[in-house]
UniProtKB/Swiss-Prot annotation:
A GO BP entry: L-proline biosynthetic process
Annotated keywords: Amino-acid biosynthesis, NADP, Oxidoreductase, Proline biosynthesis
Catalytic class of the enzyme: oxidoreductase
UniProt keyword annotation of Transmembrane present: no
This enzyme's EC code(s): 1.5.1.2
Family: Belongs to the pyrroline-5-carboxylate reductase family.
Sections of the chain in a coiled coil: none
Species this chain originates from: Schizosaccharomyces pombe (strain 972 / ATCC 24843)
GO molecular function: pyrroline-5-carboxylate reductase activity
Gene Ontology cellular component list: cytosol
Name of the protein described by the UniProt record: Pyrroline-5-carboxylate reductase
PROSITE patterns tied to this protein: P5CR (PS00521)
Length: 282
């Protein structure tokens, strides 16, 4: 038996459980022998309304509990725990009675913003393994870009399991923890930056006579399609050059964007967001 427990089953916890169940339904046991697929699922919540919502969503596939005593009991019978409570509640959750003992030798997948591996490890037994992960808001539609940062005592099997879990809600990439602030800026804050670009393209279309709903769909699908071409191996510069014919409308528009310093403005936005992210955990 392999148990998977979600400590704090809010929006992200529910998205990850949904991804796990969908992955199991789609692929069954057709995964690497190094990955032990959970067959028991538990969710720990704080309020009755949360318990009702999780139970309604997953039915008898997930056992939902409330209270520190119950949290520790579920942790004790689980092999892997997803730490997805509010970051400021982490200390109370991990230092609650019997929890430290229950987590000995277990794997913790933490998605807590600003909580470093070392800060979490200081609250846990040295035998507890920690992997820090940063998913993004697109996890809601299983299109997340998640960054996986293994702790020093995480095993290869632990990392493969984390990748399996987070690939269920999109894509994942392993990076050292020292790069997580930059990754937070690119793919954590990135949806807000991309949404702003979609808004700007939409506004331009409306300005030139396209009704708003159609302009927004045109802009959004163009962003999605271009992203998929890049993910399939096409370099952004090649895509740009392929569309830019001599004396054409594309190169004319690109020059106007370059006049507005679009490249350096976006790059500086990433730089500033990285600096801000680095201060969140201090």
């Amino acid at each position: 038996m392999s148990g998977f427990c979600v400590l704090g089953c809010g929006t992200m916890g529910k998205a990850l459980l949904t991804g796990i169940f969908d992955s199991i339904a789609e692929n069954g046991n057709d995964v690497s022998d190094e990955i032990i697929i959970p067959n028991k699922f538990y969710a720990c919540v704080k309020f009755p309304k949360e318990k009702e919502d999780v139970q309604k969503l997953f039915g008898d596939r997930v056992k939902v509990v409330m209270g520190a005593k119950e949290n520790a009991e579920m942790a004790a019978i689980s092999n892997v725990l997803l730490l997805s409570c509010k970051p400021q509640a982490a200390e109370d959750v991990l230092n609650s009675p019997k929890m430290k003992e229950a987590l000995k030798g277990k794997l913790i997948l933490s998605i807590l913003a600003g909580k470093t591996i070392s800060s979490l490890q200081s609250m846990l037994d040295e035998s507890t393994r920690v992997i820090r992960i940063m998913p993004n808001t697109a996890s809601r539609i299983r299109e997340s870009m998640s960054v996986i940062c293994p702790g020093p005592n995480a095993t290869e099997e632990d990392i493969k399991f984390a990748e399996w879990v987070f690939n269920g809600i999109g894509r994942s990439m392993k990076l050292p923890e020292k790069l997580i602030d930059a990754a937070t800026a690119v793919c954590g804050s990135g949806p807000a930056f991309v949404a702003t670009m979609i808004e700007a393209m939409t506004d331009g279309g409306v300005m030139m006579g396209i009704p708003f709903p159609q302009a927004q769909e045109l802009a959004a699908q163009t962003m999605v399609g271009t992203g998929r071409m890049v993910l399939q191996g096409q370099h952004p510069a090649m895509i740009r050059n392929d569309v830019s014919t001599p004396a054409g409308c594309t190169i004319s528009g690109l020059l106007a964007l370059e006049d507005g310093k679009i490249r350096s403005t976006i790059a500086r936005g990433i730089e500033q967001a990285t600096k801000t992210a680095s201060g969140l955990g201090k």
